[in-house]
Curated annotation (Swiss-Prot):
This is Octanoyltransferase. NCBIfam families: lipB. In the reaction, the free carboxyl group of octanoic acid is attached via an amide linkage to the epsilon-amino group of a specific lysine residue of lipoyl domains of lipoate-dependent enzymes. The lineage of its organism: Bacteria, Pseudomonadati, Thermodesulfobacteriota, Desulfovibrionia, Desulfovibrionales. One of its GO terms (biological process) is protein modification process. Catalyzes the transfer of endogenously produced octanoic acid from octanoyl-acyl-carrier-protein onto the lipoyl domains of lipoate-dependent enzymes. Lipoyl-ACP can also act as a substrate although octanoyl-ACP is likely to be the physiological substrate. The gene is lipB. Its main location: cytoplasm. Belongs to the LipB family. The keyword Secreted does not apply. It is an enzyme of class 2 (transferase).
């Protein structure tokens, strides 16, 4: 399993990279976890949610927010700097339990990571994502093609959740968003620390049992990912 830190990447650019990585994993490549932040973006999932987007949203944000229609499942959500976005691109062929088990384990990685920073989180019956009480701290929306996942999870880290003042999390009226900064009694971790913690918890859950003797992975760079994709393309030729 390989992990990559893509820094701040636009939604459409990240989607293009995911599709390239997905094709590589479908061809037998290593499972990959992409960690990043998006600029202010409202994404509308396959379950719609367009009705939950104010018609003058871009005017309200002076044009500084992108609105995109996504291939992921779920309703409407938003992304912004200070939110960890995790896009696992992994094969489910050798994992038992199918998509439901995958979603459960992805939530579990977030719950364990949050515990490291003093935030008690859990699942909420009947509602996807990760919650602290009745406040939503992480949203999920995935897609699967030929047994390989893409899209994933958005987990709020920073204090500023102002975009959620306009967009209800996953279209759920009356649901408040929260973040690590709002829930922790200790110092707020920086994004590199959050990314590293999530990578480690994700690895412990998703790495095949026989590979746990291997050292924990470290986050590689966007350039490392581009080199990997170029090498894969040359191999195919």
């Amino acid at each position: 399993m390989l992990g990559f830190d893509l820094g701040r990447t636009g939604y459409e650019d990240a989607f293009t990279l995911q599709k390239q990585v997905q094709a590589m994993v479908q061809s037998g490549g290593d499972d990959i976890l992409l960690l990043l932040e998006h600029p202010p973006t409202v994404s509308i999932g396959k379950n719609s949610g367009a009705e939950n987007v104010p018609p003058h949203l871009q005017d309200m944000w002076n044009g500084h927010v992108d609105i995109v229609h996504s291939t992921r499942g779920g309703n409407v959500t938003c992304h912004f700097p200070g939110q960890l976005v995790a896009y696992p691109v992994i094969s489910l062929k050798k994992r038992s339990g199918g998509i439901r088990a995958y979603v459960h384990d992805l939530e579990e990685a977030a719950i364990r990571m949050l515990a490291r920073f003093g935030v008690t989180a859990a699942r909420r019956q009947g509602f996807p994502g990760v919650w602290t009480g009745e406040r939503k701290i992480a949203s999920l929306g995935i897609a699967v093609s030929r047994y390989v996942t893409m899209h994933g999870m958005a987990l709020n880290v920073a204090e500023d959740l102002s975009l959620f003042n306009i967009i209800s999390p996953c279209g759920l009226e009356g649901v408040a968003a929260t973040s690590i900064a709002r829930e922790t009694a200790g110092p707020v971790p920086d994004m590199p620390a959050v990314k590293t913690a999530f990578l480690e918890e994700f690895y412990h859950i998703f790495q095949p049992a026989g590979d746990h003797a291997q050292p924990l992975p470290t986050l590689r760079t966007t350039q490392d990912l581009m080199t990997l994709l170029q090498d894969a393309q040359r191999t195919e030729k």
